[in-house]
A protein has these predicted regions:
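Short acidic/polar capping segments at secondary-structure boundaries
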Residues: 125-128, 135, 162-163, 171-174
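Contiguous, glycine/small-aliphatic-enriched amphipathic segments in soluble metabolic enzymes
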Residues: 1-140, 184-270, 274-280, 286-288, ...
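Active-site glycine-rich loop that binds ribose-phosphate moieties when present
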Residues: 142-146, 150-152, 172-198
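Short, flexible loop segments at boundaries between secondary-structure elements
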Residues: 147-163, 292-308
Length: 337
């Protein structure tokens, strides 16, 4: 295969969600970079049902060569079938779908690690449904880390045009955040961010901004002491240890202005909303979630299952398209590096 042509594996996501709809729409869309060869790991019946629901005429091509993908066909929806025994009702989540969801993710990783595929893109899943079925992970990121051969703690990065952010803490209550922010976590995130910006984003000298936790970054201890006791010492140590440009702690209310965004390549934020609000405000439909620190490239659309609009043929595929295109570009950068 031409070195510029890249196979990108796409997981099924939750079958009751918008995942199948946005997958079909994305693969049919001209915004997908021409050299990308997307392959979906899902149920044939599920995709056929969704095709009918959204009036799609795209042909399905079953992939049997899971190493070199020699039977890939252009202008088709190429699929590696997996079993889904339950009847699907779009918009109605069910714990019975959990094994199918999990199997699609596991197969994505397994095939990626044993083939010429360049990256995986995961479609949205519902954490509550997965928890109820005995899924013992906080989400995709932790589960993918358990399947990775690397033993690094993975780092979540959100990407949109003109901004990249990393939340130090993710799906935890606000009241727990201060005790979860540690010097070692900050240093680890800085290191993974630096390595990834160089190897996957082709940024030779990364500039990293670190936000404060408290209003006005603590105002020298007058509004909380996390900056003085934890964040500043961690930044100072990381500057010496990793030899990279670091700025912070910067108050989050100024970190994302149009002028300030020109001063850094990624902002490391203290918690989920601090990192995601600016991404979604800037470009709600084109945000991408990237997992750093794995031994494979993984991206996903930066939105959820949207059960409320599933089956209505109104789901927007742009975030999935952006995730597929970014996975491709990262694989090219990694190859060139």
């Amino acid at each position: 295969m031409n070195s510029l042509k890249k196979v990108i594996l796409i997981s099924a996501g939750d079958p009751a969600s918008i995942s199948s709809e946005i997958t079909i729409k994305a693969i049919e869309n001209s915004k997908i970079i021409k050299n990308i060869r997307p392959i979906v790991i899902s149920s044939l019946n599920l995709i056929e049902d969704c095709k009918k629901n959204i009036n799609s005429n795209i042909k399905l091509n079953e992939i049997k060569d899971k190493v070199n993908f020699s039977d890939y066909k252009e202008n088709n929806l190429n699929i590696i079938p997996i079993n889904l025994f339950e009847e699907i009702f779009f918009g109605k989540p069910n714990t019975k779908y959990a094994s199918f969801i999990k199997n699609s993710i596991v197969d994505c990783v397994r095939i990626k690690m044993n083939s010429i595929a360049s990256a995986i893109v995961t479609n949205p899943i519902n954490k509550e449904i997965m928890y109820q079925s005995g899924f013992n992970f906080q989400g995709h990121t932790d589960f993918l880390a358990s399947l990775s051969q690397y033993k690094k703690n993975p780092v979540m990065m959100l990407v949109t045009n003109g901004l990249k952010t990393i939340p130090l803490t993710i799906h935890v209550p606000i009241k727990n955040i201060p005790k979860l922010i540690t010097k070692s976590l900050i240093e680890h995130s800085i290191n993974i961010a630096k390595e990834s910006l160089i190897s996957l984003f082709n940024i030779s000298k990364p500039r990293i901004l670190v936000t404060g936790l408290n209003p006005h970054a603590g105002e020298n201890g007058d509004i909380g002491n996390e900056e003085k006791k934890i964040i500043i010492p961690a930044i100072n140590k990381a500057k010496k240890k990793y030899d990279c440009f670091l700025e912070g702690p910067v108050s989050a209310d100024t970190a994302f202005s149009s002028k300030k965004r020109n001063d850094y390549d990624v902002a490391i934020c203290m918690y989920h909303d601090q990192a995601l609000i600016p991404i979604k405000t800037l470009d709600f439909f084109n945000g991408v979630n990237v997992t750093l620190g794995l031994d494979f490239i993984r991206t996903s659309p930066d939105h959820g299952t949207a059960f409320d609009i599933a089956g209505k043929n109104i789901a927007n595929p742009d975030s999935l398209i952006a995730a597929i295109n970014l996975a491709y570009q990262m694989s090219i950068n990694k190859q060139d590096g």
